[in-house]
């Protein structure tokens, strides 16, 4: 998803910032597919093992002044279809623990854009 957003050269978006902003949305999407890894992640971060890692990263992003959603970075709803198509074709998508269809990418981008 970060690659899809970063491909828009006019916006000049930083890849690491995109990763940070998208991380909570992707963690929510994958939650039911990698529960044990989430418990290990929480333990490594000093959190309760049943804590919500997506919420942890939302809070962290807020504390360090990161954008809270893609909308704050200039991504609009009108871009969703092309972003989803790009993300679905990205070879990095194959490493995600949960398969994501183009339609699911559209939903994820909708969520990540925010209000």
Question: Where do the model's predicted regions map?
Answer:
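Gly/Pro-rich interdomain helix-loop hinge
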Residues: 6-79, 115
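Short, amphipathic C-terminal "tail helix"
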Residues: 77-115
